[in-house]
A protein has these predicted regions:
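Hydrophobic pocket-lining residues that define ligand/cofactor binding sites across diverse proteins
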Residues: 45, 211, 228
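A composition/biophysics-driven feature that prefers long, compositionally simple stretches
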Residues: 1-202
Length: 236
């Protein structure tokens, strides 16, 4: 099966913020933060002696690449993932085909469309697509793993795990890598967290100003979500 593959451009005159702080000036160098996070993942990968890290948890995928695509939807289905090689490329297997969402991100070396294999997407053709998925992951492991077959995964259904094991890969618990890496915060990340807190507080102020007798709870909560989205937040 031929799948679209795209190498994002490396323009230096623009910093894609992908929703976060889209219409404001970031308080830190976002590309620096992105690179540091990827380094943390790879450091933990080396500690656990794995050649690859497969991320279906969208929080982990965002941490590794900072690329986003319908995060809530993609959190409900195995429809988008990131493969991080210890000594090779980072590959984004995206939902649908939207390479513009990965443009200019220094953390992504290869863009592909995921051959999704969950039933809602492919019905009874799941076995066909999961074999293609496993073939691509196995190829990346063989090409860049240096003979190491250990692949860490944060979360994946038995269908995907069985197909990967059939390719001779040794699957390792990935959350021990992602959680311990993400627990470390740089000074720049603390500044970004403060911005997130400021947005939340602004949303709470909007709720207080909008509150009036007789209104529904949903109407009140909508002001928090409205403020969050308007100021660059993704979801609550």
């Amino acid at each position: 099966m031929s799948l679209a593959s795209f190498n994002p451009s490396r323009k230096t005159n623009k910093v894609r913020q992908h929703g976060a702080m889209e219409f404001s000036d970031p308080p830190v160098d976002l590309d620096k933060v992105r690179q540091e996070r990827l380094v943390r993942f790879r450091k933990k990968m080396a500690e656990h002696e794995v050649a690859g890290l497969l991320l279906f948890n969208q929080i982990n995928a965002r941490y590794a690449t900072d690329a986003t695509n319908m995060q809530i939807w993609c959190s409900h289905y195995e429809t988008r993932c990131v493969f991080v090689s210890l000594e090779g490329p980072v590959v984004l297997f995206d939902y649908a085909d939207h390479p513009h969402l990965a443009e200019d991100l220094p953390t992504i070396d290869d863009y592909r469309v995921l051959p999704a294999f969950y039933f809602f997407s492919v019905g009874n053709r799941g076995e066909e697509f999961v074999l293609e998925f496993a073939a691509q992951i196995s190829d990346l492991m063989n090409r860049y793993g240096g003979g190491n077959k250990r692949l860490a995964i944060d979360t994946l259904s038995h269908t995907g795990c069985d197909a990967l094991r059939a390719r001779g890969l040794e699957l390792v618990e990935g959350e021990q890598i992602t959680e311990t890496a993400r627990a470390i915060k740089s000074d720049d990340e603390l500044k970004l967290m403060q911005v997130s807190m400021n947005v939340c507080q602004e949303g709470m102020r909007a709720m207080q100003e909008y509150l009036e007798p007789g209104m529904t709870e949903n109407a009140l909560w909508s002001k928090l979500h409205e403020t969050n989205i308007r100021l660059g937040g993704e979801w609550i």
